């Protein structure tokens, strides 16, 4: 009996696939890439047609030895790495590292790790797609050239430890440009007017908004203008001029792409893109489900396609019919394909088995796995469901020369909202509106003028930044999360209450990049380069020609930057904590585990201290300050500033409220307070003044 070897990236994926194949199949993981460019040098021979100098990655010797041993025993080798550019490149590197040119081998791909998909991929085995490999090589070489040649300039001109990149530098520029828009924004005053009108037979007054006069809509820019209108309306009769009832359909959403999954997980679950991708990877590669073994729960997570297979569409609609009724089954919203942005080889992100509803496997998943899986499940089911139907009623009201409008919206049919109510939509307005007749006289109860000011553009969040990058065609599904992770890790931006704020360091880097490398941080140029990479994938352009056309101007820019750019001094954040060894005020520095305090007298004085943030709550055990800390793995917890003398520690934020049953301190859980004593278990609502309490951000050391 012939023996087959299947090589995948991860042990989890190997474990899931193994159960689908017979005893004559061995499945081994390469643990990601086995060859790459060297870290210590550029690794690209500029003079020799930009030839990459690949080396075996340090630490991969044992893995390759095991793989070579398995290859010798196998009659055929299947390279089953992920179905994208990166996966194709890993297979290509394995081909060379394992010397498969004289071996019977094939490349297989699947968008979901199911028995049907894996076995079908073996039936449709193929050669390595060199267009995909070359697209990955072009990206890798471009990114290496940009990063390795600009980063040392930033080290020399600003400070060490900085980096630049084709996508990360554009992302930083977008955030800086938005910050500038916000800073330059000048609020404009405007007013609105609402009339509260009594309707015969209704206890609740009708709320009608001023929309204009007989001829046109009007804008009110000052209190004087508003007072003129109020004076005119005194004593005027309010009469119903027309009632209009219309039906509106709200289409079901498209299933998730990588971008939209990251956006929704950020806004709904408060997951950073990096966390979303990590958990989605677990769901894709396989989770142990009782009675089923290791199961891949979702399709491939790096995709910009909203396409759904015929089989998955039919299975979802059958599930919807049984669970909700035939009237809830929809046609399924069809996406408009944009060739500039969509690589449509994959499906959208969806569940693999309709039998594994979130509720049925909740106990088998971690909390985060369940929440993300439920989000994916609900979105996919919603995409196959009927539209929601609204009954909209609009009442036009005349008051002399002015016109008011009252409206109500009633959900007539939930449709997809029954599983995926994005904005918690519900019926709004006075539902009695449609029963009001034309020419009905209404009694004025009150006129309520309100002053407003136009608002500046919103700060970017991780979700809105991902959306913008995708809209501009910058980066690909695999790059959004690491891009945001990099600019936050470099301290170019900080995240506060979901908003991304540029730091002084980020501004300095962005200004230098705009001055010396304008094209690198130009949105349109970066999008054009992405388009060229797509053309390489399609076999329309040779990958080295992309580099050849890019490099000459870039080389000149690097040479000019080295000569002409002046040094920029970034001042450290000085604290009121005094160094107990030399008496200087300590400054905030950043390390692998976040902030710490360091003496500015380095290297003469090497004193450092942990940096904590006060949360404005006295320690329940000793009365000292409770401070927010982090474990070495980055998990946040609350401790006492007097540690180690005081051993107080809590994973949840403690409250100043004492338990009314046992006197122990309470801890915050959502909008509730829970007694810290497990024996007590008392729960109560959080006092209003305790909600949304901000940390002071003061430096504390011990």
Model-derived segments and their meaning:
Residues 1-140, 149, 212, 220-223, ...:
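Intrinsically disordered, low-complexity regulatory segments
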Residues 260-272, 466-476:
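Short helix-coil junctions and helix-kink-helix linkers
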Residues 2-4, 16, 25, 151, ...:
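Basic, low-complexity terminal or inter-domain segments flanking catalytic cores
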Residues 16-20, 66, 89-97, 117-121, ...:
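Alpha-helical scaffold elements adjacent to nucleotide-binding pockets in ATP/GTP-utilizing enzyme cores
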Residues 113, 117-195, 246:
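C-terminal or mid-to-C-terminal helical accessory/interaction module adjacent to the motor/catalytic core
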Residues 216-254, 440:
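Metal- or metallocofactor-binding catalytic centers and their adjacent structured scaffolds
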Residues 139-149, 167, 197-199, 248-260, ...:
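Core structural elements
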Residues 82-83, 159-163, 245-254, 264-269, ...:
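Conserved short loop/turn motifs at secondary-structure junctions
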């Amino acid at each position: 009996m012939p023996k087959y070897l299947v090589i995948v990236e991860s042990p989890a994926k190997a474990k899931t696939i193994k159960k689908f194949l017979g005893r004559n199949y061995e499945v081994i993981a390469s643990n990601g890439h086995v060859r790459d460019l060297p870290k210590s040098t550029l690794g690209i021979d500029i003079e020799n047609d930009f030839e990459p100098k690949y080396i075996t990655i340090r630490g991969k010797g044992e893995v390759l030895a095991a793989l070579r041993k398995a290859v010798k025993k196998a009659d055929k080798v299947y390279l089953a790495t992920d179905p994208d550019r990166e996966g194709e490149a890993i297979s290509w590197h394995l081909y060379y590292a394992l010397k498969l040119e004289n071996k019977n081998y094939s490349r297989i791909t699947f968008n979901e790790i199911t028995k049907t998909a894996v076995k079908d991929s073996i039936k449709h085995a193929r050669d390595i797609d060199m267009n995909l490999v070359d697209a990955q090589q072009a990206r890798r070489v471009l990114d290496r050239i940009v990063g390795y040649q600009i980063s040392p300039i930033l080290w020399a001109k600003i400070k060490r430890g900085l980096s630049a990149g084709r996508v990360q530098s554009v992302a930083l520029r977008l955030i800086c440009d938005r910050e500038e828009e916000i800073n330059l924004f000048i609020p404009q005053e405007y007013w609105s007017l609402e009339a509260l009108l009594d309707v015969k037979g209704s206890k609740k007054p009708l709320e009608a908004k001023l929309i204009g006069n007989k001829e046109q809509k009007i804008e009110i820019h000052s209190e004087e203008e508003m007072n003129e209108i109020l004076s005119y309306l005194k004593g005027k009769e309010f009469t119903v001029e027309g009632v209009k009832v219309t039906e509106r359909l709200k289409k079901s959403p498209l299933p998730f792409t990588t971008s939209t999954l990251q956006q929704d997980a950020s806004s709904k679950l408060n997951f950073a893109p990096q966390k979303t991708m990590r958990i989605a990877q677990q769901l894709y590669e396989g989770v142990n489900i009782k009675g089923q073994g290791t199961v891949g729960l979702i399709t491939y997570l790096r995709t910009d396609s909203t396409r759904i297979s015929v089989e998955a569409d039919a299975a979802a609609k059958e599930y919807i019919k049984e669970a909700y009724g035939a009237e809830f089954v929809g046609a399924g919203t069809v996406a408009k394909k944009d060739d500039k942005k969509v690589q449509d080889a994959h499906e959208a992100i969806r569940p693999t088995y309709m039998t594994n509803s979130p509720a049925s496997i909740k106990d088998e998943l971690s909390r985060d796995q369940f929440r993300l899986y439920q989000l994916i499940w609900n979105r996919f089911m919603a995409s196959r469901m009927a539209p929601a139907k609204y009954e909209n009623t609009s009442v036009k009201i005349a008051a002399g020369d002015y016109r008011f409008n009252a409206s109500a919206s009633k959900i007539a049919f939930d449709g997809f909202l029954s599983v995926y109510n994005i904005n918690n939509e519900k019926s709004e307005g006075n539902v009695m509106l449609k029963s009001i007749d034309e020419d009905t006289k209404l009694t004025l109860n009150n006129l309520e003028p309100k002053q407003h000011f136009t608002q500046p553009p919103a700060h970017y969040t991780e979700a809105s930044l991902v959306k913008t990058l995708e809209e501009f065609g910058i980066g690909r599904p695999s790059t959004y999360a690491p891009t945001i992770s990099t600019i936050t890790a470099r301290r170019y931006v900080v995240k506060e209450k979901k908003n991304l704020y540029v730091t002084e360091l980020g501004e300095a880097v962005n200004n230098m990049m705009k001055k010396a490398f304008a094209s690198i941080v130009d949105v349109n140029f970066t999008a054009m380069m992405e388009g060229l990479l797509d053309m390489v994938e399609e076999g329309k352009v040779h990958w080295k020609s992309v580099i050849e056309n890019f490099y000459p101007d870039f080389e000149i820019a690097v040479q000019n930057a080295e000569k002409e750019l002046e040094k920029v001094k970034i001042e450290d954040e000085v604290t009121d904590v005094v160094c107990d060894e030399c008496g200087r005020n300590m400054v905030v520095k950043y390390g692998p585990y976040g902030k710490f305090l360091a003496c500015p007298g380095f290297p003469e004085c090497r004193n450092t201290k942990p940096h904590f943030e006060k949360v404005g709550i006295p320690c329940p055990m000793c009365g000292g300050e409770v401070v927010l800390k982090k474990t070495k793995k980055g998990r946040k917890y609350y401790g006492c500033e007097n540690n180690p003398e005081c051993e107080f520690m809590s994973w949840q934020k403690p409250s100043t409220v004492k338990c009314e049953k046992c006197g122990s301190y309470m801890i915050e859980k959502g909008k509730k307070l829970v007694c810290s004593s497990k024996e007590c278990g008392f729960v109560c609502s959080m006092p209003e003044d305790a909600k949304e309490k901000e940390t002071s951000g003061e430096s504390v050391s011990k």
